[in-house]
Amino acid sequence: MNDLTFITPEINWTVLGMPAFLMIWAMLVLIVDMFTSDRRVLLTLSLIGLGVTAALGALDYGSTISGFSDMLVFDKFGVLVNWILLAGTALTLLIAFDYMPRQNLSQGEFYPLVLFATSGMLFLVQSTDLVTIFIGVETLSIALYVLTGFAVPQFKSGEAAIKYLLLGGFAAGFLVYGIALIYGMTGKTNLAQIANELSTWQSTGKALDDPILLAGVGFVLIALGFKVSMFPFHAWTPDVYEGAPTPVTAYMSVATKGAAFAAMLRFLNVAFPALKPEWQLLFGLFAAATMAYGNIVAVAQTNLKRMLAYSSIAHAGYMLLGVLAASEKGISAFTVYLLAYTLTNLGAFAVLIALENRGMPVFELSDLRGLGKRSPLLALAMTVFMFSLAGVPPTAGFASKFGIFRAAWDANLDYLAIIGVVTSVISAFFYLRVIVTMWMRDTEATEPQPTYATASLSLGVIVAVIGIIAVGILPNIFTDLAKALVLTVAP
């Protein structure tokens, strides 16, 4: 009888370090929750885990290392996006710390679930293979399905979770089918190997516009477009954002977008640069429709969470311009935009959390009446966040939008840059309406709703405001840093 030899695959811990460590740490936090009810311990452990994960990215900073048969990569672009996602996760945990007990929600599972979702996002950002892209998408999605229904005693939370699960499963089907079609046509799942195969097609005179290949690319982009709330795959966004617990909504609005857009950048720029004219034309239409639809529909919203949901759709359109530019300047502009949007949107949701009492959610615009008198500091912070979302200088929103529009213009996508400017002007209406309501409208309630600006939430708001002003005043520092870090993904 022949002896069987088991050969273990070589594990490159530098490549896998960030997502693997955070996944293991999430399990540790889950175990600790079994032995303590002190939520401060869980928050502290979670923040330590995020900090150590970020430090792991700095160990071999500047290197480009592939692992697991080139299915994952550790590079400067991935580390930068991962750092932004980790910072957004830390802010989410800070603003959610006092929200959970105030809403009488179990929080023991909340922290590890957020860490599980973030580990999936880090894995997705580093993915350079269709298989690992699928694993990353599903890892983050499963945790987000549970988080969406975390306030399950509330009907809207359960409804949102079911909608997100069903539509997310449908998007996963598109992703799997697209991967199958691409593999069937090229015989590869590695992004770089797919690009090499298409180069062989070109050298032998084989047409690249094969309908099966194009369908496969389209299906994968539909799945990723669902995650970033790109029109017309956005239908789930308003209902899920409204029904999910507010900290979860804040987290989903920034972190999921960042990870999915990073995967989209790798997918298009690494695997399919040969099809750039085709996907640039198609995505140009999607970007224009996404910017226009999100901003126009947001004008009619009086529910704050739905308004911010449609706003997030519009901002997905702006981020798409960075993808479409397909250049060093475009990708660096995208990373700065992601940082600015993360700080701004999390800050805006933090203000809503500060006003949200158990059984008395602050969802309507009228709930902000008189906030300037009741809590001028919160109103001032919200003003900064609204100005940044609208793109008013000297905020991070202005600097990042300017960079995105300039990158699009330099890439001969001037029509998209013009549409972006026009839709930004439209968006100023509903952002400024929030400011006017806070400062110039008196509350109609005999007993104004109290505010809950606790220490952890206040810290999160302060960090967001400082970050927004810093990026807005010193945009060149962040832009130059981003340019130095995107060389590993720009074509």
Swiss-Prot record:
Subcellular localization: Cell membrane
Which one GO biological process term can you cite for this protein?
Answer: ATP synthesis coupled electron transport
* Predominant location category: membrane
Q: Which top-level enzyme class is recorded in the Swiss-Prot or TrEMBL entry?
A: translocase
Alphabetical GO CC annotations of the entry are:
plasma membrane
Record keywords:
Cell membrane, Membrane, NAD, Quinone, Translocase, Transmembrane, Transmembrane helix, Transport, Ubiquinone
List, in alphabetical order, the Gene Ontology terms for molecular function in this entry. Answer: NADH dehydrogenase (ubiquinone) activity; NADH:ubiquinone reductase (non-electrogenic) activity; quinone binding
Which residues are in coiled coils? none
For this protein, the record's InterPro entries field holds: NADH-Q_OxRdtase_suN/2 (IPR010096), ND/Mrp_TM (IPR001750)
Transmembrane segment boundaries: 15-35, 41-61, 77-97, 105-125, 130-150, 165-185, 211-231, 247-269, 279-299, 307-327, 333-353, 378-398, 416-436, 459-479
Q: How does it assemble?
A: NDH-1 is composed of 14 different subunits. Subunits NuoA, H, J, K, L, M, N constitute the membrane sector of the complex.
Its family remark reads: Belongs to the complex I subunit 2 family.
What is the recorded function of this protein according to its Swiss-Prot or TrEMBL entry? Answer: NDH-1 shuttles electrons from NADH, via FMN and iron-sulfur (Fe-S) centers, to quinones in the respiratory chain. The immediate electron acceptor for the enzyme in this species is believed to be ubiquinone. Couples the redox reaction to proton translocation (for every two electrons transferred, four hydrogen ions are translocated across the cytoplasmic membrane), and thus conserves the redox energy in a proton gradient.
Q: What is this protein called?
A: NADH-quinone oxidoreductase subunit N 1
Q: Which organism is it from?
A: Herpetosiphon aurantiacus (strain ATCC 23779 / DSM 785 / 114-95)
